[in-house]
Amino acid sequence: MNHDKEALVQWIQEHQEEMILFLKKLVQTPSDNPAGDCYPIAANLQQQLCELGVENVSLVEVDEEAVKKTGMISLANVLGSTEFGDGEGPNIVLNAHGDVVPPGLGWTVDPYGGEIIHGKMYGRGVAVSKSDITAYTFAVLALTQVKMNQPLNGKVDLAFTFDEETGGDLGPKWLLDQGYIKPDQAIVAGFTYSAVNAHNGCLHFEIKTIGKSAHAALPHTGIDAIEATSKILNALYEYRHTLAKKKSSIPGIDFPTLNVGLVSGGINTNVVPDECIIRVDRRLIPEENGELAEMEFRELVMQVVSDIPGVKVEIQKVLHAKSYGPVPEDTPLIQALAANWQTIMNEPGKLPINGVPLYTDARHFFAAGVPTIMFGVGPKVLEEANGHRADENIRLEDLQAATKIIACTLYDLLVSQRA
């Protein structure tokens, strides 16, 4: 580690309390999505960044009609752009999201309290992904505040968005499409003990089965939509077993999955149901083609219904989130990250690089042809942090470590001017 990196690490250590306070304020600002009223936290974050001295901070508003179409109430994106040298070096984007899933039940602490217990901060969104916002912010601040021996050249954009939980189309994708960010490389919210270079895609379907209502005393005069749906469900669960035979070659990703997450139907106990709706989640491994998977799914459902007289079915694709990666491990971004991880972390071996079965905003950067890696604040596995569960938390030492690694990685990329 050279003198410049030592100075970066020292600066981050000296500003630990400011980092904790910054994160605590974010956790204490509700940003549940749904309901998706996320303009207030975006405005709050913009103000905090300005007070910290982040350069060129802006609140980028999205068309209200487009926001309403996503089911959200309000939304804005927050950008902060820092230029080094003449800015002709690489343009690196750091992206994390500040919208969170609702707290749910089972908490032993205030989900919006940011309480610190035994070296961990607790709160909804502290792991997913307000801690990443904090790490990225203070990594950039360190680069601007520390006097360097080696000149830096390039640009680092903070891109903080608030619609990841509903797809990210008005966050990273919109910022890319509109030209607000033009990255050569991107780091997206992730974990501290591994780097993620691939993740699954996802298809969401709504299947509406339509029958004919009748009096329960005369069921033969109606067409039972729930009974027809049960046959669709049986076929889907059988199909799920066949999916397990498709294996991904990417470490950390196993096989495609299928989950029926919602069933709704019927009028009353004494009425033959004329309608039943189910929602299905079909995860795609990176090796799969989403269009072919959709075709296979539709054919399966229609085949079942074709054998049931009088029943109609409507299949609506609600979501198609494409997979991400795998990004080659020899890309300069991953190489720089891995080298700094090994220097700063007190862990045996090299930085683990693997895929994950969930899907994230990283896919938007990958689809735009941007070399992307997921790395940030968090444990070895998401379950340890209770992400999307009660008592979500992060270790404050992981916040420190991730910030140091990101700052040193940015330093290497900007010094070397590798794009």
Q: What is each PLM-predicted segment?
A:
Residues N2-A7, V196-A198, H204-A419:
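Metal-dependent amide/peptide-bond hydrolase catalytic core
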Residues N2-M121, Q145-L152, T360:
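Acidic/His- and Gly-rich active-site-bordering loop/insert found
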Residues L59-V60, N153-T161, I187, S248, ...:
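Beta-strand segments within the central parallel beta-sheet cores of soluble alpha/beta enzyme folds
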Residues S58, I92-L94, A159, Q185-I187, ...:
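Hydrophobic/aromatic beta-strand patches that form the interior of the parallel beta-sheet core
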